[in-house]
């Protein structure tokens, strides 16, 4: 309730939002996971595309953040497989691949957004919150 006595709906909480983070660089993956956890998310880190897809099939996630260049299964392939199981889950690619063709391939494989490394962590956080808020409308 504000000072005028009006009620506002509660802002959506991120505390119960689960993110699948698939990143093969262990240092970067851990730093990003810790940042997202400190920002209020429940984050599961997978070290490659195969592990990421196995986790996706077993658990329920609200969003996926995928690297593109990974061993065993690249992020584009993983995104297509995720889309076959869930058409609506938000997918963000977070990658060093900056070529126009890669960005287009990312969107065509099911990505909702494509961020290049290095990136601004605050912008990533705003994109995540915005996508999750729209998903819950």
Model-predicted regions and their roles:
Residues 119-128, 132:
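C-terminal output helix
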Residues 45-63:
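Acidic, metal-coordinating helix/loop segments flanking the phosphotransfer/catalytic sites
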Residues 67, 95:
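Active-site residues of response regulator receiver
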Residues 71, 99, 117:
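The feature encodes the CheY-like receiver
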Residues 23:
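Conserved acidic carboxylate
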Residues 26-44:
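Two-component/phosphorelay signaling modules centered on CheY-like receiver
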